[in-house]
Design a protein with these regions (language model features):
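Ser/Thr/Gly/Pro-rich low-complexity, disordered linker/stalk segments of secreted
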Residues: 36-81
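Serine/proline-rich low-complexity intrinsically disordered segments, especially terminal tails, linkers
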Residues: 8, 53, 60-62, 119, ...
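Generic secretory/membrane-interface signal
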Residues: 13-15, 24-27, 53-59, 490
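Terminal presequence/propeptide segments associated with secretion/organelle targeting
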Residues: 71-805
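Short, intrinsically disordered low-complexity segments
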Residues: 3, 8, 31, 35-38, ...
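Gram-positive Sec-dependent secretion signals
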Residues: 1-46, 167-169
Length: 805
């Protein structure tokens, strides 16, 4: 499952979003001449009919066409690829030049111009019907090849305001396939008082000076200047989302904070690279309330969160509605490795809302939860660790990492678990189909066929051995203002991370099922336990060079070394970390299927998954490096770009560290998990804590929760846990944080220091290592791949120790 932030549309786009380039649609409108063939006129200087075009003599019937007006209907086949880009024959060109062309109707419904916008025409040029007037009309075909909108001095399309544009028409000589172009001015179309794009989104109108400012942003601005530019425009849009309400109405919990308090806060926050008090308040951040003596009484958590908008930088010169990642395609070996180690997990649970008999009651809605005895939930998890057998046989006890809100679905009601992963050595640059309907994926299903022991068997095989709940030395309530302590006294902190143990040795032969492309596979594999587990894990234990590692730093304290430059030439020289994410969302928002594919998979989206990565959407239709006809230069360019990973998003709403794009403090900027506090199946609520990252181009649908974020060395950075709708990014929990001292800005609260794998932070009390230490405290001979020397802190590699812990 995937927690979401607000779905509310960010209609008032930021000014820089308005700087997105608009591509002009060029759609051929082929026309068919319904009249009988009319022979070309043979010029007087060619009496022997020796035309260079081998034309026949004209007859008297030709005269009938000479002064008529002829409608050109869609349907006449003219292959645009067959046109000849040379001047028409000399004897024909004067006739073509004399032709007059006009618009007969703008679409198939013959809608008047006043009821259409220029944007309505842009994607439907093939519906425009033309009329030709002149001589020898049967010799020619006309079609609209281009629509040229009006532009302002910043090169923005402003036809939505002017209602005016120019149609570029090709008049084609049918015999020679040569053509001339003419232009038709069109006007009187529906107008808008503001600029809107073809999707109906409002965009900020700019001028040449603003364009220059954007150029300066990329080429001259430092991090602080970029943050100031982005934040100023973002706040305009954000306040519009609040209907320009006063701060006292947006955040009544902060009504006692004076201007003196704010001024003091702003002075210190600026020195720390943080936003002003008022801006943080509008963004829904956790903020201090003060005592009469100016000291901080404690913090106040916002009751209502605003919607978030995208970053214009992330979407610059791209389709911002597609900046969600790349579906069903592996571009490079790093994604391939992650695909071999990452699983789509599905839990089948008893439905607590089910009422026997409701499934047959026609009066109850078909999608009512009470009709279904079982419920299914999906997430993403990946191989974390395994217990090393003493006899050096292939491991049977494995540990998988995922989000807490995914692992929480594994509980006393779970009757079955399905693990789906890519088969070993999956192909690169080859589009897959839906995960459940593709031979490159295999589904391993575990569950008892006996109704009386289904949940018991699952609980014996699967266990959640670590949850990052109440993992810090202090509770959230310790930082809150006095007036909120009682309200939040029972809410502990959490990081969205958990570890699931799977003991495959406990699975009985008849509790296995194997499916690939909706067909049973691996007949008899359940009789060979070692081979089965080796197959399921893609031989992970024997591939030491592919096994995961963990970074021993964080990007807040090492931002300068890992801040990818914006300009392409600079990025090609960049040696810092690049980011790779891979998960399995439901295919509901997989927009990459073609019309033919859609027909094949129609009806399967809601119950199937698509492999998803944070690669650029543009690569889906890039020519393959092996494709015939592609130049060597293009092949080399594509190959180089496809090896690259992603970078941090410039989304500024969640970015609590203003001059460090992609870096955020969860407790301050997003204490909720979605729009509410995280609630586990036992009804306990938790407040989000820890360091968070925001990767660009990763906004998959539900099911991708638990996706790992790694660098180019296959070192794990964190786990993706929250989709932030329409922002081209999401929230990733950092598994390691060096902490950050706010110098008293938020009272006693500072970003905590922790390492959720190795447990070496000064502010934490639990970790995966400590969970294993407790689990095996009476078994000194147990070792795992990550902890080959034991589980005590003294055995941890020194590179994971903090200098000031």
């Amino acid at each position: 499952m995937l927690k979401r932030k607000s779905k509310k549309r960010w209609l008032l786009a930021l000014s820089a979003i308005g700087l997105l380039a608009f591509s002009t649609a060029i759609i051929a409108a082929s026309c068919k001449n319904e009249q009988k063939d009319i022979k070309e006129v043979i010029p007087p200087n060619n009496p022997n009919n020796e035309s260079t075009n081998q034309t026949k003599p004209s007859d008297s019937t030709d005269k009938k066409d000479n002064t008529t007006t002829k409608p050109i209907e869609p349907g006449q086949t003219v292959d645009p690829n067959a046109l000849v880009d040379t001047p028409p024959p000399a004897e024909i060109k004067p006739v073509m030049d004399a032709l007059e062309v006009s618009v007969a109707q703008y679409n198939n419904a013959n809608t008047p111009a006043a009821q259409l916008s220029i944007n309505d025409l842009k994607n439907n040029l093939d519906q425009i019907k033309l009329t030709l007037k002149g001589n020898q009309l049967s010799l020619f075909t006309a079609r609209v090849s281009e629509l040229r909108p009006d532009y302002n001095d910043a090169q923005q399309n402003i036809s939505s305001k002017t209602g005016h544009a120019v149609l570029v028409v090709q008049i084609i000589h049918n015999k020679s396939k040569t053509y001339i172009t003419k232009e038709i001015e069109i006007s009187g179309f529906k107008t808008s008082p503001v600029l809107v794009d073809e999707n109906g989104f409002i965009i900020q109108e700019e001028n040449a000076a603003q364009k220059q400012q954007q150029l300066d942003y990329f080429t001259k601005y430092n991090a602080d200047q970029r943050a100031a530019f982005d934040n100023k425009e973002y706040m305009v849009g954000l306040k519009n989302q609040w209907n320009n309400a006063l701060l006292k109405d947006v955040r009544p919990d902060l009504s006692t904070v004076s201007n003196n308090h704010k001024n003091h806060f702003d002075e210190l926050s600026k020195s720390l690279g943080l936003d002003t008090y008022d801006n943080q308040a509008y963004k829904g951040y956790t903020l201090p309330i003060y005592n009469a003596d100016q000291s901080v009484n404690g913090l106040s958590i916002a009751k209502k969160l605003p919607p978030q908008g995208p970053s214009w930088v992330d979407a610059y010169n791209r389709d911002r509605f597609k900046n969600k990642g790349l579906a069903r395609l592996l571009l490079n070996q790093q994604y391939q490795t992650m695909g071999e180690q990452t699983f789509s997990v599905l839990f089948t649970n008893k439905n607590p809302n089910y009422k026997a008999g409701n499934e047959n009651d026609s009066k109850i809605a078909t999608d009512d939860k009470s009709k279904f005895p079982l419920s299914v939930h999906r997430g993403t998890m990946w191989i974390l660790d395994y217990v090393q057998p003493e006899d050096n046989s292939y491991p049977t006890k494995w540990y998988f990492a995922t989000n807490l809100h995914v692992a929480d679905l594994l509980n006393e009601t779970t009757e079955g678990v399905s693990l789906t992963r890519l088969n070993q050595k999956p192909p690169l640059n080859t589009p897959f189909s839906l995960t459940e309907y593709d031979d490159h994926f295999t589904q391993f299903i575990i569950g008892s066929s006996n109704d009386h022991d289904k949940t018991q068997r699952i609980s014996e095989i699967f266990k959640v051995v670590y949850k990052a709940t109440d993992f810090l030395n202090k509770d959230p309530v310790d930082y809150l203002a006095d007036q909120y302590k009682d309200e939040y006294k029972d809410k502990k902190e959490f990081a969205d991370f958990a570890v699931i143990e799977v003991d495959f040795s406990k699975v009985k032969n008849n509790e296995w099922s194997f499916v690939s492309n909706n067909k049973a596979v691996f007949n008899g594999l359940n009789n060979d336990q070692q081979k089965l587990i080796q197959t399921l894990t893609n031989d992970y234990a024997n591939q030491k060079d592919k096994q995961i590692k963990f970074i021993n730093y964080d990007y807040l304290s090492n931002f300068e070394n890992h801040s990818a430059p914006l300009l392409k030439p600079d990025f090609e020289k960049y040696t810092g970390d690049q980011f790779y994410l891979l998960g399995y969302p439901l295919a509901i928002e997989d927009f990459y299927f073609s019309q033919y594919d859609t027909e094949k998979v129609q009806g399967l989206y809601r119950h199937s998954t698509s492999l998803w990565t944070n690669a650029k959407y543009e690569f889906f239709k890039q020519p393959s490096v092996d494709e015939v006809g592609v130049s060597e230069e293009t092949k080399a360019k594509n190959q180089k770009e496809m090896q690259q990973g992603g970078r941090f998003s410039y989304q500024i709403g969640y970015r609590s560290f203003l001059n460090k794009p992609g870096i955020s403090d969860a407790f301050l900027a997003s204490p909720y998990n979605g729009n509410k506090f995280m609630k586990t199946h036992d009804n306990k609520e938790f407040i989000s804590f820890g360091l968070q990252y925001m990767p660009r181009d990763y906004e998959p649908y539900g099911g991708a929760s638990g996706s790992s974020m790694r660098n180019q060395r296959n070192e794990v950075i964190g786990l993706y846990h929250t989709k932030t709708q329409n922002t081209s990014t999401g929230l990733v929990l950092a598994l390691r944080s060096s902490g950050f001292d706010y110098k008293g800005l938020y009272g006693s609260y500072n970003l905590p220091q922790y390492d959720l794998i190795y447990g070496t932070g000064k502010d934490q009390k639990t970790s995966y290592r400590q969970a294993l230490e407790e689990l095996y405290k009476n078994q000194n001979n147990v070792h795992t791949n990550l902890f080959p020397n034991g589980f005590s802190k003294e055995k941890v590699d020194s590179k994971f120790l903090f200098k000031n812990s």
